[in-house]
Every structure is written in structure tokens, then in C-alpha cells.
Amino acid sequence: DIPAAFNNIHRKHSIIYSCSLLYYFKNELSQPDLVSESFKETIKFAETISRSEFVDTLDSHSEDVQNFSKWLSSTGVDVIVAPTTFGVAPNRDDEELSDMNLFYNYMHVPMAYFPMWVDETDHLPHGLMCISNLKDDYNLISFMKKIEKKYKSNEGYNFKSKG
């Protein structure tokens, strides 16, 4: 299990992301007709964040990245393999789930994805994500090449094809 110290990552990511958008898109925000409602909501959230909270969050982000890297190294795990998402993509107006993609992105770890199959019911792709530790890209690439060699066919990737 991931240590409880990392439980607040979704909020930290939201703070950094929304405040960065507020800063970098000031010109676009002066023309509200050109900005989507979801973008405006993100900006509204950013405007509730104080400068000191933003700076503190940036500082803690660097610490989180280093602490996660140390923790992952201590586990002896080379690569984490998990589903790309918890399920199908949510509708635009649905609340965003706190999925692991966001977590690993926040932690700056290398990630790669494999589409594995298309679900016969919802006709949407499903796949796997693979994650390695910070600055361990070559290990991840080597692992991914092994997966590709084992499971790739002319029709794509399929766990059942080469057992």
C-alpha cells in the first residue's frame, strides 16, 4: 500500500494545475467567450488559493516526489502494472475520480500505456499502465519491450493470444 502521507495528492495537484492555468492563460481569460465553462470553474478554484498556499504546495510537491521515490526504492519493486483507469471515462459533467494516473503524474515517475483489448459491451479500449521509479526510464522501456514481444499480434495486444 502507498503510505498515508500521500493521501492529499489530488488536492495538491489541483492547486498547482489550476493556479498555473490562471497564470499562463491570463490573456485568454480576458475574452470569456473563448473559454469553456469547465475552464472557468478551474479558474474559480484557483482564485480561492492564496499565494502562500500555492508556494507551500509547490514546496511540498518537491518533497513528495523525493519521498515517493525513496519509498518506491525501499519496496524493491521495479515496475508497477495496473489498469489504465478504474473504469470507462466519466462524462464531462461527472465528478473526476482520484485515479492513479494523476497520482503518478504528480510524482513525476515514468509511465507507459498498453492498449490491450476493446470491451465487447461498451466498445471502449482497456489497457495497462506501467510505472517505474523516478529516473528509471530505461528499466521501464525494457519491461515494456518484453510485454510487447509476448502479447503483440497483428490485431494489437491480447493477453489470451500467447499465454
Describe the function of each predicted region.
Residues 73-77:
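Glycine-rich phosphate-binding loop signature in dinucleotide/nucleotide-binding domains
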Residues 1-12:
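Gly/Ser-rich, acidic/histidine-flanked active-site/gating loops
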Residues 70, 102, 145:
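Surface-exposed charge patches
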Residues 55, 59, 66, 107-163:
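Structural helix-boundary/capping segments
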Residues 13, 84-103:
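Short, surface-exposed loop/helix-turn segments at secondary-structure junctions
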Residues 12-69, 115-128:
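Short helix-loop capping/hinge segments that flank enzyme active sites or metal/cofactor-binding pockets
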